A protein has these predicted regions:
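Conserved acetyl-CoA-binding loop-helix of GNAT-fold acetyltransferases
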Residues: 44-58
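Conserved small/polar residues in nucleotide/adenosyl-binding loops
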Residues: 96-98
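Compositionally biased terminal segments of proteins
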Residues: 46-47, 91-94
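C-terminal structural segments of small proteins and small subunits
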Residues: 66-90
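A short, structured beta-strand/loop element
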Residues: 20-42
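Anion (oxyanion) recognition and catalysis
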Residues: 61
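Conserved beta-hairpin
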Residues: 10-20
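Active-site rim helix/loop that mediates acceptor-substrate recognition in acyltransferases
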Residues: 1-11
Length: 98
């Protein structure tokens, strides 16, 4: 699985068979706002979603920028996987109840 950061469309993409999994984002200063998660029905299982989120969050961590998860599924994933908590900007923890 090859993760693509499509900067023109401001989204992460992952090709799955004939479908595309997408996380839309907005980049502001040194923060990336993850605004929408789209998982194709053909692979809509929790394992795939988690793998996709891990790929995206690892890419963001490598770029050393903060992440603001505005999409509920992504915020829930970060709540559940505390190793990504360090990527959140100061002050955001209480907003997403982490």
């Amino acid at each position: 699985m090859a993760l693509i950061d499509n900067t023109f469309l401001r989204q992460y993409e992952l090709q799955v068979n004939d479908d595309l999994a997408i996380i839309e984002y907005s980049l502001q200063d040194r923060k990336i706002f993850l605004t929408k998660l789209i998982i194709p029905e053909s692979v809509s299982d929790d394992n795939f979603t988690e793998e996709f989120l891990i790929l995206v969050l690892e890419d963001i961590r490598d770029r050393e920028i903060s992440v603001v998860p505005t999409a509920p599924t992504i915020a829930k994933f970060i709540r559940k996987n505390r190793k990504y908590k360090k990527m959140l900007p100061v002050g955001i923890l209480s907003l997403i109840h982490i």
